Amino acid sequence: MHYGVVSPTGDLVHYTPVPLPGPRLPHDMTFTENYSILNDCPLFWKEDLIDRGIYATQFHRDMPTRLGVIPRYGTEKDIKWFECDATYVLHWINAYEEGNEIVVDGYFQFDPSPGVAPDATLEQRMFRFLDLFALQSRPYRWRLNMKTGTVKEGPLSDTITEFGMINALTAGKKYEWVYSTIPAVGWFGFEGIIKHNVVTGTEENYRLPDGVYASETVFAPRSSPRSEDDGYL
């Protein structure tokens, strides 16, 4: 894995290699005010097939998910790894520092490699990895204790959802709201938006009319916002 920091002008101002046990498939990452959080999930290419030009993934349920906390301008020797329950995280929501803990929120897939019927069509085989209901993707929180090295983790909600966005002004800081997609059952489509309060656990749904679909949303704050949630989607 390669970790770096890019300046506002697009220049690479810091770089360090991050050794891993083998090829991995990190899709996203998150950060706090002082740290970046890397991930090593146990869903990755079958190495024996790569040489044959076949790119097939396998989920290793007996391996932990590892989250690596690195100071923003740290190096390999500064990374602190935490072992967590096995999953694959496609997208992270946010992260922040709270006392001795790094709080990390993302979407935990309870079944990263869903099964398929022997007579399934090619379309069905492909879409099982795009069906959020098959993947059982839910908002989830990890608390990484930098002092003790322990982890506390668990779901923030039982709702199946993904592709969350926050008010960008709260990135890396303690926050309250995330706006996620309402997925369609059985295929890759979004039928609305879920507004989730990560402090109280409450949710509000906005569903689109039948036959209308959306992409992940973007939050645009007002020019003089009165609160984190004061803006537009």
Task: Please name every model-derived segment.
Residues 1-233:
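Beta-propeller domains
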